Amino acid sequence: MCDEDETTALVCDNGSGLVKAGFAGDDAPRAVFPSIVGRPRHQGVMVGMGQKDSYVGDEAQSKRGILTLKYPIEHGIITNWDDMEKIWHHTFYNELRVAPEEHPTLLTEAPLNPKANREKMTQIMFETFNVPAMYVAIQAVLPLYASGRTTGIVLDSGDGVTHNVPIYEGYALPHAIMRLDLAGRDLTDYLMKILTERGYSFVTTAEREIVRDIKEKLCYVALDFENEMATAASSSSLEKSYELPDGQVITIGNERFRCPETLFQPSFIGMESAGIHETTYNSIMKCDIDIRKDLYANNVMSGGTTMYPGIADRMQKEITALAPSTMKIKIIAPPERKYSVWIGGSILASLSTFQQMWITKQEYDEAGPSIVHRKCF
């Protein structure tokens, strides 16, 4: 792994659910692992086993039966800085096996995040990890780089937060950004709830991970929700079975599409918000009338929560219903969209024109953490 050029930039996309990390210029992240820190629930009794007081990522996932799992990033905002530091440490030293003090580092964050969040990120990077330079990029702008466009509206939906960001000729239009704190983790929680109605009980943080897996493997978005509900009620054609880790098999039917339907009808989980089709439409309507046509024709989807089968067709149908009747509407859902934020970051950090954008250690020492608002927008 040490074949990397001395100064290759690192790209670290810290999602609420997964950390995607790697080297600028690569076409995919080297390391993808869950953003979790696990701590033992029980007292260690066997001496000399080298038990640790905390586990990060995949190791926490594999030992989840005896751990309490916590996600330090909630709704795109870092809520536990000590755990976040552990995750970054794990990323640099264990996953990428690099010395952060030798590499400029590009981090990502959700749009409309509190300012203090990015200041603290900047401070930790320079003071704890001693990076030579860093930059904080807005997550939703990056998938556009990855799809080779300069104009479009990005719907980025991950585990913690969903947002629409319209971009015209490379400029994000901040007044039209829509943020919805409803994403993959809420869908997992909702699936836990509706599976309980079926008589399957999932309660612990470890069991939530099982439900997440069920969601990722079996859920899909219905083109017509009412029709699909009727089909599910009258036949068992939509039922699928899933084997739990202990060998017990459970069957799920209409839960498969009721779960992601929440994206279009947030009232399912008691949220008073508009669905993702309406936030997309509202975001476009907040933009200048002359550029709307270009946005309608370039709806770019990104993030793990846009990976449901059927979501692009449903989105096409819903936006067509909202938009003027003659409008050409195109939904772009690239197959690699799960990682397109990272891919966009990799492209951005390796552009020659980007090199003067880095915040250097020297600039940080002179201006302090608030420099991040001046240099990263």
Curated annotation (Swiss-Prot):
The modification Tele-methylhistidine is found at H75. InterPro entries: Actin, Actin/actin-like_CS, Actin_CS, ATPase_NBD. The modification Methionine (R)-sulfoxide is found at M46, M49. Oxidation of Met-46 and Met-49 by MICALs (MICAL1, MICAL2 or MICAL3) to form methionine sulfoxide promotes actin filament depolymerization. MICAL1 and MICAL2 produce the (R)-S-oxide form. The (R)-S-oxide form is reverted by MSRB1 and MSRB2, which promotes actin repolymerization. Monomethylation at Lys-86 (K84me1) regulates actin-myosin interaction and actomyosin-dependent processes. Demethylation by ALKBH4 is required for maintaining actomyosin dynamics supporting normal cleavage furrow ingression during cytokinesis and cell migration. Signal peptide: none annotated. The keyword Signal does not apply. It is an enzyme of class 3 (hydrolase). The modification N6-methyllysine is found at K86. The modification N-acetylcysteine is found at C2. One of its GO terms (cellular component) is cytoskeleton. One of its GO terms (molecular function) is hydrolase activity. It comes from the Eukaryota. Pfam families: Actin (PF00022). PROSITE patterns: ACTINS_1, ACTINS_2, ACTINS_ACT_LIKE. It is found in: Cytoplasm, Cytoskeleton. It catalyses: ATP + H2O = ADP + phosphate + H(+). The modification N-acetylaspartate is found at D3. Polymerization of globular actin (G-actin) leads to a structural filament (F-actin) in the form of a two-stranded helix. Each actin can bind to 4 others. Actins are highly conserved proteins that are involved in various types of cell motility and are ubiquitously expressed in all eukaryotic cells. PANTHER family: ACTIN. Belongs to the actin family. In vertebrates 3 main groups of actin isoforms, alpha, beta and gamma have been identified. The alpha actins are found in muscle tissues and are a major constituent of the contractile apparatus. The beta and gamma actins coexist in most cell types as components of the cytoskeleton and as mediators of internal cell motility. This is Actin, alpha skeletal muscle.
